[in-house]
Amino acid sequence: MSDLIQKAQKVKEASKKLMNLSESQKNLALSCISKKILDNMEYILVENKKDMENAQNKGIKGALLDRLKLTEDRIRQICKGIEDVIKLPDPVGEVISMWKRPNGLIIGQKRVPIGAIGIIYEARPNVTVDAAVLCLKAGNSVLLRGGSEAINSNVALVKTMKEGLIEAGIDEGSIEIVEDTSRETAVAMMKLNEYLDLLIPRGGANLIKTVVQNATVPVIETGVGNCHVFVDESADFEMAEKIVINAKTQRPGVCNAAEKLLVHKNIAESFLPMIVKKLMTKGVEIRGCSKTVEICKQNGIEVKEATEDDWYTEYLDLIIGVKVVDSIDAAIEHINKYGSKHSEAIVTRDYFNAQKFLDFVDAAACYVNASTRFTDGFEFGFGAEIGISTQKLHARGPMGLKELTTIKYIILGSGQVRE
């Protein structure tokens, strides 16, 4: 516990120095970090191999194991992400608006760093770098606490990034990692109001729930993605098939993958057998409503019947829940009841249904005729993201650099006093 406090203190002190660094100083630090990661690739891969072996021994497999894995190509992609962040404009110091009051006061809003940010996340080593790099570019220090599955990889990455900070002449306390991965230490971190200005959890529903229930530090919820694709009665079948297959199978272990497929009843008998067969050839397990099970059975396809819990579940695996709905209104009602307010898609040729979906679905990102897989900082043009916020306060959707800043009011006077 004392180690946690010491690291939190370092992060807090570093945040005071980072807030006034120039864009060129921060970019130099990021460039040094990228170079050090490439230089230390062999060391990082050796440490990642330890994590992979430990995970396999614990029975972790499939998409969850893939999230943990680092390769030379993935490390180069991480470094490319750093270079992309370097190219992004620094939001710190941006004057958002300015106005003059009748009494002569000039009032302005400008962007400033949030300060010291804590990130609690699960088995994805790339988050270690993404989070640190984005926080640093926005003038924030960061205290990282990853999952036990990736501890060797995460420690190796943080040690390497610290080398980059030292080379750039930046306080190495700007990036710290909590090496104790126990639940008790994580909960203690959630209560470090004295040192942390913000806490961002990245992971599954249980992690998010634990943080929200225990944290006294302000929290931005991210990540849980019970995402739907609704195939409307006017949908182009070829387009719908492409979108559903991509949204479910391209990378099933991420939060913007589709977990549920809703199909309008008027096309269910023609569309469902086709899409179910395609999904099954991709290794996807189907969990259907009673109508889905009936239609599939009539076409010689056996599928498992979904339970009520299935409609709430983020699988993060090659599993999809399928439901036949009576109308677009029923689809919207289902999404708003069971969804996680992350990313939702409609496939339709009906302009008015598309507009209704966009207006009435409560989610951070709503799509018309496109895969949910695009809800991502890179795809939105933000560079790397810190997470995808599913709440409505401060930030919503992919969180880039601007979402890691806050507003300061600047008031310029010439001796005014309030009457």
From Swiss-Prot:
Coiled-coil annotation reads none
Listed EC numbers:
1.2.1.41
Could you tell me which pathway this protein works in?
A: Amino-acid biosynthesis; L-proline biosynthesis; L-glutamate 5-semialdehyde from L-glutamate: step 2/2
Entry keyword annotation includes Glycoprotein? no
Main subcellular location? cytoplasm
Q: Where in the cell is it found?
A: Cytoplasm
Listed GO cellular component terms?
Answer: cytoplasm
Q: Name one GO biological process term.
A: L-proline biosynthetic process
Q: Which domain of life is it from?
A: Bacteria
Question: What does the function comment of this entry state?
Answer: Catalyzes the NADPH-dependent reduction of L-glutamate 5-phosphate into L-glutamate 5-semialdehyde and phosphate. The product spontaneously undergoes cyclization to form 1-pyrroline-5-carboxylate.
**Protein name in the entry:** Gamma-glutamyl phosphate reductase
